[in-house]
Amino acid sequence: MLNPPLNQLTAKVNSKYLIATTAAKRARELDERRETALLDQYHSSKPVGKALEEIADGKIEPVVPKEYLG
């Protein structure tokens, strides 16, 4: 089961693709530099889970280049 739930994530970011790419980039950053944590406490022990929790909490948002906004 995904924690946080997908509907909670899509309430913050309306694209599953953006959620996945943002979480992957943030997870890589968390894995390389653990001191960059944005939350006081995480439910997940894995970097991807931590990144998803940060997205659900509104601590990070995807960056979309202007040329893709149409």
From Swiss-Prot:
<dbReference type="Pfam" id="PF01192">
    <property type="entry name" value="RNA_pol_Rpb6"/>
</dbReference>
<dbReference type="GO" id="GO:0003899">
    <property type="term" value="F:DNA-directed RNA polymerase activity"/>
</dbReference>
<dbReference type="InterPro" id="IPR003716">
    <property type="entry name" value="DNA-dir_RNA_pol_omega"/>
</dbReference>
<comment type="similarity">
    <text>Belongs to the RNA polymerase subunit omega family.</text>
</comment>
<keyword id="KW-0804">Transcription</keyword>
<protein>
    <recommendedName>
        <fullName>DNA-directed RNA polymerase subunit omega</fullName>
        <ecNumber>2.7.7.6</ecNumber>
    </recommendedName>
</protein>
<keyword id="KW-0548">Nucleotidyltransferase</keyword>
<dbReference type="InterPro" id="IPR036161">
    <property type="entry name" value="RPB6/omega-like_sf"/>
</dbReference>
<keyword id="KW-0808">Transferase</keyword>
<dbReference type="GO" id="GO:0003677">
    <property type="term" value="F:DNA binding"/>
</dbReference>
<keyword id="KW-0240">DNA-directed RNA polymerase</keyword>
<comment type="function">
    <text>Promotes RNA polymerase assembly. Latches the N- and C-terminal regions of the beta' subunit thereby facilitating its interaction with the beta and alpha subunits.</text>
</comment>
<dbReference type="GO" id="GO:0000428">
    <property type="term" value="C:DNA-directed RNA polymerase complex"/>
</dbReference>
<dbReference type="InterPro" id="IPR006110">
    <property type="entry name" value="Pol_omega/Rpo6/RPB6"/>
</dbReference>
<dbReference type="GO" id="GO:0006351">
    <property type="term" value="P:DNA-templated transcription"/>
</dbReference>
<comment type="subunit">
    <text>The RNAP catalytic core consists of 2 alpha, 1 beta, 1 beta' and 1 omega subunit. When a sigma factor is associated with the core the holoenzyme is formed, which can initiate transcription.</text>
</comment>
